[in-house]
């Protein structure tokens, strides 16, 4: 008789006290002391796949998981400083091209930004969120498979947001280890507080999520299906 060996992996979770969330500060201070202090959000590890070979992408866009063609851009895999810098260049170039076409041919274009990412670095992500609002050309975001952690921040900042039927999103707190002298830890905590405020501002201003609901979602690792994303205002349409 064939023996089946099962290896059970156990995870240790920090105890999170039950709190009454009456203010934004309550959200940000929930279990931050166990979860933060760096410029990155904890990302969900998802196996990465290369783009289909038959698709011809611009050579410039092959680095850093940024692929695409004119007005169609794809973000695949971990979000890093390098590929956020590339993505910023691509968005600015697309915006310039769109304005030139509008002036010369009177044809309007939008930038389609397709996202398949488990998240990554927060600080460069916040710049991409700002840039989407700053350029003149509308950016339509598409969740293709999954947009977790910092990738969800980029997605919700689109002028119009789409998700495929079986795709999902996830939002949570920032994560990292804290070390150093007491004063340094206090400084890092204050930095964390400010960054969590920035994250909360984006979700609260771009979605239908209430402060209390946001508190709950930030503290848990909950995959939100497309229907829930639509209900919460994380997306505008399921395709």
Pin down the residues of each PLM region.
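Terminal-region recognition feature
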Residues: 22-239
């Amino acid at each position: 008789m064939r023996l089946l060996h099962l290896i059970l992996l156990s995870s240790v979770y920090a105890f999170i006290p039950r709190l009454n969330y009456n203010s934004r500060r309550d959200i940000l201070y929930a279990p931050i002391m166990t979860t933060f202090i760096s410029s990155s959000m904890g990302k969900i590890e998802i196996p990465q796949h290369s783009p289909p070979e038959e698709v011809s992408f611009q050579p410039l866009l092959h680095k850093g998981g940024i692929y695409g063609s004119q007005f169609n851009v794809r973000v695949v895999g971990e979000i890093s400083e390098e590929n956020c810098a590339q993505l910023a260049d691509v968005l600015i170039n697309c915006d310039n091209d769109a304005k030139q076409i509008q002036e010369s041919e009177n044809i309007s274009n939008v930038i389609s930004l397709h996202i398949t990412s488990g998240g990554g670095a927060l600080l460069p992500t916040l710049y991409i969120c700002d840039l989407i609002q700053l350029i003149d050309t509308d950016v339509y975001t598409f969740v293709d498979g999954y947009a977790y952690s910092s990738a969800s921040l980029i997605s919700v900042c689109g002028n119009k947001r789409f998700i495929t039927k079986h795709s999902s999103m996830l939002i949570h707190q920032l994560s990292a280890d804290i070390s150093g002298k007491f004063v340094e830890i206090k400084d890092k905590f204050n930095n964390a507080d400010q960054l969590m405020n920035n994250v909360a501002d984006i979700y609260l201003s771009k979605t239908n999520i209430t402060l209390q609901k946001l508190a709950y979602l930030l503290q848990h690792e909950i995959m939100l299906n497309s229907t829930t994303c639509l209900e919460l205002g994380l997306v505008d349409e399921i395709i």
